[in-house]
């Protein structure tokens, strides 16, 4: 968690209008995902154009990241408003292999291994978690369809780009199992199941 905690320091404060450090429990409030970006990727106003082209989504406020302040979107979706924060940051891809839960070809793995940065997107879920997860995937794919892969930090899953593409183009909501992971945790001769997710 320390990597994402460091990334969020000061960025959530920019979104919230204060200068406090991001709380360690930020992952309990925000669904956090990181799209692994290809080399020479740049974040431009085009992301807003792509989002505005999505059916059923209306942008009410938009701002690109500036210095140490996260970018911000306020969107209307199914009669609800959602705040979405986003920013580019360095990405420690060597830490992600442990969370690989989908199939990746050797070519996929080579591309992932060469990634140095990610587009990080965080939002609060309001109402139906499946619909919010689907919305976040649609926003991310619209912002960066050329992503190399997607790391869902809240569910601790490294997702194949093709899976993301199929999910956002489907008329069906992702299965609930996609929203969480269950891990076996061992400590002091005891084993228990640990769940990571955002609801």
Located regions from the model:
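N-terminal alpha-helical "arm" segments
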Residues: 2-52
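Catalytic micro-motifs at enzyme active sites that drive phosphoryl/nucleotidyl and oxygen chemistry
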Residues: 21-24, 63, 104-111, 128-129
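Short, flexible beta-strand-to-coil junctions
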Residues: 37-41, 122-130
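N-terminal low-complexity, intrinsically disordered segments
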Residues: 39-109
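Structural alpha-beta junctions
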Residues: 53-62, 141-153
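Well-ordered, non-membrane alpha-helical segments in soluble/globular domains
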Residues: 98-104, 129-140
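Glycine-rich, often proline-containing surface loops adjacent to acidic residues and nearby aromatics
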Residues: 111-126
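Aromatic/basic-lined ligand-recognition segments
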Residues: 155-199
């Amino acid at each position: 968690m320390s990597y994402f905690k460091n990334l969020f320091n000061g960025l959530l404060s920019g979104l919230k209008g204060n200068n406090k450090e991001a709380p360690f429990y930020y992952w309990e409030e925000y669904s956090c995902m990181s799209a692994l970006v290809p080399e020479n990727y740049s974040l431009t106003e085009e992301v807003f154009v792509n989002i505005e082209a999505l059916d059923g989504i209306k942008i009410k406020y938009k701002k690109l990241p500036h210095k140490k302040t996260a970018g911000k979107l306020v969107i209307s979706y199914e009669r609800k408003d959602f705040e979405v924060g986003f920013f580019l940051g360095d990405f420690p891809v060597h830490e992600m292999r442990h969370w690989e839960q989908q199939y990746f070809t050797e070519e996929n793995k080579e591309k992932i291994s060469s990634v140095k940065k990610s587009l990080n997107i965080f939002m609060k879920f309001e109402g139906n978690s499946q619909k919010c997860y689907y919305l976040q995937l649609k926003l991310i794919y619209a912002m960066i369809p050329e992503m190399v892969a997607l790391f869902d930090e809240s569910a601790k899953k490294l997702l194949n780009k093709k899976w993301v593409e199929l999910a956002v183009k489907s008329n069906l909501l992702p299965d609930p199992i996609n929203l969480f992971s269950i891990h076996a945790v061992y400590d002091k001769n005891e084993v228990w199941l640990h769940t990571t997710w955002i609801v």
